[in-house]
């Protein structure tokens, strides 16, 4: 799959019809599972080897926010694009082995100084139960002025 080129028309269509849902699996094998040089320095809830807690190996914020970037890039071909601002809220832990369904809604489009901007709302769900996991609001420049 190659997404359509990022243009005002592409993002207007995404705003009207919605975008492609993407899925990602969180596990101890994921490259983001140990995002510190020393995994033992990570919070116990995020480590897979944490004996001091029964709840361990939960997805870290880097994975959650990356899901937002990945779905954004999966819906429109952008090169380059500039991630400007993010706000997010977690609703539930993403546990080891969870498949995460990610959906994006375009909330606003605007132009400033020749740059094309998009404000998007990204929602993460458990792919099986459809329980909400997190929400992300993101602002990005998807097309730099020529």
Where are these regions (language model features)?
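HotDog/MaoC-like acyl-thioester-processing domains
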Residues: 1-12, 90-146
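Residue-identity detector for glycine
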Residues: 18-19, 57, 68, 97, ...
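Hydrophobic beta-strand-centered segment that forms part of the acyl-chain substrate-binding groove
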Residues: 61-106, 135
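Generic preference for hydrophobic/aromatic residues in regular secondary structure cores
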Residues: 22-35, 82, 86-88, 100-102, ...
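Generic detector of well-ordered alpha-helical segments enriched in charged/polar residues
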Residues: 43-46, 65, 69, 139
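Non-catalytic linker/capping segments at the edges of enzyme domains
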Residues: 1-56, 74, 143-146
């Amino acid at each position: 799959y190659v997404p359509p080129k990022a243009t005002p028309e592409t993002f207007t269509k995404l705003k009207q019809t919605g975008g492609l849902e993407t899925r990602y699996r969180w596990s101890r094998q994921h490259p983001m599972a140990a995002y510190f040089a020393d995994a033992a320095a990570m919070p116990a809830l995020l480590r897979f080897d944490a004996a001091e807690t029964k709840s361990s190996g939960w997805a870290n914020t880097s994975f959650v926010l990356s899901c937002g970037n990945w779905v954004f890039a999966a819906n429109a071909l952008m090169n380059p694009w500039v991630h400007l601002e993010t706000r997010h809220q977690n609703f539930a832990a993403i546990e080891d082995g969870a498949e995460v369904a990610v959906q994006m809604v375009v909330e606003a489009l605007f132009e400033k100084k020749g740059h094309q901007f998009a404000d998007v709302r990204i929602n993460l769900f458990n792919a099986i139960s459809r329980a909400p996991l997190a929400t992300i609001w993101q602002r990005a420049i998807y097309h730099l002025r020529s």
